[in-house]
Amino acid sequence: MRVVIQRVLKASVTINHQLKSSIGQGLLIFLGIEENDKQEDIDFLVKKIVNLRIFNDNKGAMNRSLLDIEGELLCVSQFTLFASTKKGNRPSYIRASKSEKAIPLYEKFCATISSAMSKIIQTGTFKTNMKIKLINDGPVTICIDSKNRE
């Protein structure tokens, strides 16, 4: 499981010119699911995401977490995070999980992070062409792979 985390002042998802969801200050998470991902990958990432100290304290140091600031979260599925560009110029997505497995894991991830935050999170729609608007804060962008826990 792989995430791209972006600290935002606000973000939104639009589908077919209709606003689907939006958040204020918090995190926009792009979530990629791999074929062999499990609950332990979800648990690792959720704990890491909600506790990452990437928000500024009153001295301007990144010392506060999403939980500390009571921020919001928007989670968008992103199978292209597992793109392979090893051969040729057309990316291969063979490592990305098939929908039948990915959708339940995406829903579990969203439910688990919502529970960890004690609030409802916002989401995109799986397997749908979405327009994402965001205002980066910083910018701060962090990539985490549950299989590479550096």
From Swiss-Prot:
Q: How does it assemble?
A: Homodimer.
Q: Which UniProt keywords apply?
A: Cytoplasm, Hydrolase, RNA-binding, tRNA-binding
EC numbers: 3.1.1.96
Q: What is known of its domains?
A: A Gly-cisPro motif from one monomer fits into the active site of the other monomer to allow specific chiral rejection of L-amino acids.
The answer to whether keyword Flavoprotein applies is no
One biological process term in Gene Ontology: D-amino acid catabolic process
An annotated Gene Ontology molecular function = Ser(Gly)-tRNA(Ala) hydrolase activity
State the family named in the UniProt similarity comment for this chain: Belongs to the DTD family.
Q: Which cell locations does it reside in?
A: Cytoplasm
Q: Which domain of life is it from?
A: Bacteria
Has the keyword Hydrolase been applied to this entry?
yes
| Motif Gly-cisPro motif, important for rejection of L-amino acids positions after renumbering to this chain | 138-139
Q: What function is annotated for this protein?
A: An aminoacyl-tRNA editing enzyme that deacylates mischarged D-aminoacyl-tRNAs. Also deacylates mischarged glycyl-tRNA(Ala), protecting cells against glycine mischarging by AlaRS. Acts via tRNA-based rather than protein-based catalysis; rejects L-amino acids rather than detecting D-amino acids in the active site. By recycling D-aminoacyl-tRNA to D-amino acids and free tRNA molecules, this enzyme counteracts the toxicity associated with the formation of D-aminoacyl-tRNA entities in vivo and helps enforce protein L-homochirality.
Substrates-to-products reaction catalysed: glycyl-tRNA(Ala) + H2O = tRNA(Ala) + glycine + H(+); a D-aminoacyl-tRNA + H2O = a tRNA + a D-alpha-amino acid + H(+)
Q: Name one Pfam family in it.
A: Tyr_Deacylase
Task: Cite the source lineage.
Answer: Bacteria, Pseudomonadati, Bacteroidota, Bacteroidia, Bacteroidales
Write down any Gene Ontology CC term. Answer: cytoplasm
Q: What is the protein name stated in its UniProt record?
A: D-aminoacyl-tRNA deacylase
The record's section on HAMAP family has: Deacylase_Dtd (MF_00518)
